[in-house]
Amino acid sequence: MNQRINSYKMFGHNPKRSILSGDGTKLEVQSIFKTIQGEGIFVGYPSIFIRLGGCNLACNFCDTEFEDFKLIDIDQILNKVKNLSLNSKNAKTINLVVITGGEPMRQPIGLLCQKLLDQDFKVQIETNGTLYRSLPKEVFIVCSPKVGKTGYNKIREDLLPQISAVKFIISKNIVEYSIIPEVGQSAYDIPVFVQSMDQNDKRLNNENNELAVKLALESGARLSLQTHKFLGIE
């Protein structure tokens, strides 16, 4: 069954966690669940989410809980993904795995990605673009850049050629998030999405939606909606 949205959200209260090394046979995992991908390039696809623990940033609008994690063996992860991909008749009906967080690139995820690909899953990574890992070229990487102390963090040069799409979070009342910035996407003709920020305030959210639509029409960017929130699923 789809999991309901957790009412606890980070909102920048998470510790900034360090980058992990290792062979990737064990990963810090917050949760693994099946749902419908609610946003971005695979919106609407039945998906299995692997939510990894910890992040190297602490964004004060973060609407996800990712600190309640455990160190799990990769074989356990793969076994759970396989079981979740099967329907009531034991047929595989879910073919997309989304690895998110937190920040997935904080951990050595290359082995997990390759093993998922070997099992004929599509793999999508959601990252903030500040870290780099060497990943199989078949992996879809969606980058959602965040604002640092001096404006938007540029996407790492070594990551840019591998990115499938860039997603900008839009807020009318936070100046830094009220624009579509240049963070390296134009040089590689990377598709751009805009998505309104969820600020847990109906008036602010309506204003954010209006601005996101305006920016999409002005720039040609695609509008991304968090449809999973409308459906009440994670």
Curated annotation (Swiss-Prot):
S-adenosyl-L-methionine binds at residues 102, 144-146, 195-198. It catalyses: 6-carboxy-5,6,7,8-tetrahydropterin + H(+) = 7-carboxy-7-deazaguanine + NH4(+). Substrate binds at residues 36-38, 51, 100. Keywords: 4Fe-4S, Iron, Iron-sulfur, Lyase, Magnesium, Metal-binding, Queuosine biosynthesis, S-adenosyl-L-methionine. Its EC number is 4.3.99.3. InterPro entries: 7-CO-7-deazaguanine_synth-like, Aldolase_TIM, rSAM. [4Fe-4S] cluster binds at residues 55, 59, 62. GO terms for biological process: queuosine biosynthetic process. It is an enzyme of class 4 (lyase). The keyword Magnesium applies. The keyword Lyase applies. Homodimer. This is 7-carboxy-7-deazaguanine synthase. It comes from Rickettsia prowazekii (strain Madrid E).
